[in-house]
Amino acid sequence: MNEKMNATLGNAFPKERIRYAMLSFFLAQGLCFSSWASRIPDVKDIFEVNYAFYWGLVLFLIPVGKFVAIPLAGYLVSKLGSRIMAQVSVLGYALALFAIGTAHNIYLLGVYLFCFGVFWNLCDISLNTQGIGIERLYGRTIMASFHGGWSLAACLGALIGFIMIVSGVTPFWHFTLIALLIGVTVLVSRKYLQEDVAVESPEEEKEAEKKEAPALLSFIRKPEMLLIQLGIVGLFALVVESAMFDWSGLYFESVLQVPKSVSYTHLRAHETDQY
């Protein structure tokens, strides 16, 4: 039965291999994120930003990039497909991490952090869209395993960050190593990604597009109250998470005055708890 389903969906590879390939993309995203989070105090010291307000403005460019990418991600995934966008977004995410390590002034750092936020959200949308397609292939829910893999990779990334700090490796070489590792992962796993399967016929899609006209006014429509409520809950959840990742290391170092190598054991503990 599974072989028939694979043939129907046009899959040339075993579904287990497809699943593990998709898992590797989630692992790459988690590794990229925690690599940045583990070196935030070092990057701050490199640019000698002594005022928390100014540093907060710099870090704020990441969520700004994520916000800008919300409509962009949906459009690109719908037009290009999640298969292409998953590859582009993960490679772009790794490239943005590498660029952060090369920044030689605070303005370039801000630009790279903005791009980091954009590709972060592109990864979220495209990878989860691919995951939904693989769930259809399996006929059951497996998304939790992908998200668990993300957390496991984030934990591993924090451990690597700990080793890099103890060894005196600069953020540039740290980020370069991670970017190369992610690039190899994408090149190896990309062929197993699946094309999006249309859930509507072409005629139904054309009819839906006609109903959505005029497109210029469609974004003005009032959202449902449930959507607003969920958005508010998500906003506060992200505020707490951002405070944890962006500022805890600085708090441990500047207030509690513990070594950098020790300050990021809390990040590994937090990621382990998520997993």
Question: What is each stretch, according to the model?
Answer:
Residues 71-92, 97:
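Conserved MFS/SLC helix-loop-helix module at the cytosolic interface between two early adjacent transmembrane helices
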Residues 116-146:
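Cytoplasmic helix-loop-helix junction between adjacent transmembrane helices
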Residues 38-52, 247-261:
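Short amphipathic helix-loop junctions that connect adjacent transmembrane helices
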Residues 102-104:
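Helix-breaking motifs and short loop linkers at transmembrane-helix boundaries and internal kinks
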Residues 15-35, 227-240:
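Pair of pore-lining "gating" transmembrane helices in MFS-fold secondary transporters
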Residues 150-194:
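Helix-loop-helix hairpin linking two adjacent transmembrane segments in secondary transporters
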Residues 60-73:
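Central cavity-lining transmembrane alpha-helices of secondary-active solute carriers
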Residues 265-274:
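Conserved small/polar residues in nucleotide/adenosyl-binding loops
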